[in-house]
Structures are given as structure tokens and as C-alpha cells.
Design a protein with these regions (language model features):
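Conserved acyl-donor/pantetheine-binding loop and adjacent beta-alpha core of acyl/acetyltransferases
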Residues: 75-107
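C-terminal "cap" of GNAT-fold acetyltransferases
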Residues: 166-180
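Conserved N-terminal entry element of GNAT/NAT acetyltransferase domains
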Residues: 1-25, 29-33
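Conserved active-site alpha-helix within GNAT-family acetyltransferase domains
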Residues: 121, 133, 145-163
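Conserved acetyl-CoA-binding loop-helix of GNAT-fold acetyltransferases
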Residues: 107-110, 116-129, 152, 156
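Active-site rim helix/loop that mediates acceptor-substrate recognition in acyltransferases
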Residues: 41-68, 77
């Protein structure tokens, strides 16, 4: 149990959950909520429902926190993409079996009324634990250079900015990576 404050200053007990397909509607609702509230839409590249489903079916993990009403307030996606073109290892100029050593933090979102509690950092630390348990050597992610909060969270966690490039249909992104 994690004690956090919502934007009204009320202390809330948040519970860590490993999410499964039964949470797909809540996952989409949380992501839609984030997108609606973003003034600058280029800060976040949304994931399609089918992608979330395939991540769960293909060995990925979606983890998150729920509030006392069991509503999803934050989530993060962990996935290993192997030789698939979406593997950030390609962005890091890795080849061959080195690509199999890469896992990624595919998405992290925190509901606006719970920001400022370090939930993104906590979820990324939990993903790092998952990655270590699976023998992953490199953890990678992307973040908009204009999203200073996400970039700073990754930097504080020991990630380095490895590339600055256009991804996701022309959005500028830092590719960040960390050896674990």
C-alpha cells in the first residue's frame, strides 16, 4: 500500500497491481483521460487498444496503481520486442542477438490529480525489477524532449539520452537507455 496525495490534498491509499486483460477498458480510459487533458498533444503518443492487448498476450506486463475505489490512477507498460522493428535497440544501433537483451518502458501515464507523487518513478523502478528478473541487460524508453517531467524522471533513474529523432509519425523523441 502506498500513501499518496490527490490534487485536493487528501491522503489516498494506492495499491500496486499487475494488470491483465480484464483491465483493458480502464487502461484505455486512463490513456484517453491523459490525452484529453494534454494541451500539447505531441507530448504523448497514445497506444492503440489492440497494441495493449498484444503486449499482454505476448509476454509483456502492464503494471499500475489503483485508488481506494479501485480506479486505475497510473500505469506503465513493459515489453520485450525481440527482433520486431519497434525494438528501441534498433534506435541504439544494436544488431543481432544484442536486440534480445533490450526491454522497454513502452508507456507510463499518471492521472493528473495524482501527479507529483513520484508514481512514474516508482512504476519505472518496478519495471526495472521485472527486467532484471528476466535477464535483460538494457532498458530503453522514449520521451518527448518537451516533457521535462518524464525526461527528468528517466535521467534521475540513471537513463541517458542516446538519440534525438523523429518517431511515431513525425514526433520528436529522445531515445533513453540504461544498462541494468
Amino acid at each position: 500500500m502506498l500513501k499518496i496525495k490527490n490534487k485536493l490534498g487528501i491522503i489516498v491509499n494506492a495499491r500496486y497491481k499487475i494488470l491483465d486483460l480484464s483491465y483493458i477498458d480502464e487502461i484505455m480510459r486512463l490513456q484517453d483521460n491523459i490525452m484529453e487533458q494534454l494541451e500539447d498533444k505531441q507530448l504523448y503518443a497514445p497506444t492503440e487498444r489492440e497494441e495493449f492487448i498484444s503486449y499482454l498476450k505476448d509476454g509483456g506486463k502492464i503494471i499500475g496503481y489503483v485508488d481506494e475505489k479501485n480506479e486505475l490512477i497510473a500505469m506503465a507498460v513493459y515489453i520485450k520486442k525481440g527482433y520486431e522493428e519497434g525494438n528501441y535497440g534498433y534506435d541504439l544501433d544494436l544488431e543481432g542477438e544484442k536486440l534480445l537483451e533490450v526491454a522497454q518502458v513502452e508507456s507510463t501515464v499518471v492521472r493528473s490529480d495524482y501527479r507529483g507523487n513520484g508514481l512514474q518513478r516508482i512504476l519505472c523502478e518496478k519495471i526495472e525489477d521485472i527486467a532484471k528478473s528476466e535477464g535483460v541487460k538494457i532498458l530503453a524508453s522514449t520521451a518527448s524532449p518537451y516533457n521535462k517531467y518524464s525526461v527528468n524522471t528517466f535521467i534521475k533513474l540513471g537513463y541517458e539520452i542516446k538519440k534525438d529523432k523523429l518517431k511515431y509519425g513525425g514526433l520528436r523523441r529522445y531515445v533513453l537507455a540504461k544498462e541494468i
